[in-house]
Amino acid sequence: MESMKQVVVATKNMGKVREFAELFERFDLEVKSLHDFPHIEEVEETGETFEENAILKADSLSRQLNAIVIADDSGLIVDALNGKPGVYSARFAGEPKDDQANIDKVLQELNEIPFDKRKARFYCALAVAFPEGDKKPVIVNGTCEGFILEQRRGENGFGYDPIFYVEEYKKAMAELSSDEKNAISHRGRALRKLEEKIPEWFLGE
């Protein structure tokens, strides 16, 4: 019997790993994460765009592991802050990464800016890299539009979810159930685009 084809997700975030595992198990693809390869060092994100960082991570790890690797780079883009925090979303308030400090910094920088001028979006770039040298990395992306609230709301999610207002639900992202969030989130939308490509990219159909 042929063993299941493996896909490595370039993250240690188990929430992300579960999202990918649910998608890929429908196609008999086994998902591994960086927890399964403790000797591998994290790739430094030196790109200037989400796409560059996702490709950088996927390509480097694919060559190291000789495996198909999926990497995502995502973050928050706030129009009134000229696109910040952008690719620096995870470390906006500096090292070490701290979600609460990042939220505080965004709220501070938007102080006294009215709600209708606080337009923002979450952006996710997903890159897939293949160990075969002749196959270039491929990429999909997804966005979720909203506004930045003046204070935190909700207990769910992570990152900037408590201050991101989703008009479709009239709630903060952190007030949504996981099903509601997956239906509209940037990563959920990118994953659905990826799902359409699985037969072609992963199964050679």
Curated annotation (Swiss-Prot):
One GO BP annotation of this record: nucleoside triphosphate catabolic process
Function summary: Pyrophosphatase that catalyzes the hydrolysis of nucleoside triphosphates to their monophosphate derivatives, with a high preference for the non-canonical purine nucleotides XTP (xanthosine triphosphate), dITP (deoxyinosine triphosphate) and ITP. Seems to function as a house-cleaning enzyme that removes non-canonical purine nucleotides from the nucleotide pool, thus preventing their incorporation into DNA/RNA and avoiding chromosomal lesions.
SUPFAM superfamilies tied to this protein: ITPase-like (SSF52972)
Cofactor: Mg(2+)
Catalysis performed (reactions): XTP + H2O = XMP + diphosphate + H(+); dITP + H2O = dIMP + diphosphate + H(+); ITP + H2O = IMP + diphosphate + H(+)
Catalytic activity, EC: 3.6.1.66
Residues where Mg(2+) binds: E44, D73
Keywords from the named record: Hydrolase, Magnesium, Metal-binding, Nucleotide metabolism, Nucleotide-binding
InterPro entries (UniProt xref): dITP/XTP_pyrophosphatase, ITPase-like_fam, RdgB/HAM1
Residues that, per the record, bind substrate: T11, K12, N13, M14, G15, K16, S74, F158, G159, Y160, D161, K181, H186, R187
Protein family according to the UniProt entry: Belongs to the HAM1 NTPase family.
Protein name according to UniProt: dITP/XTP pyrophosphatase
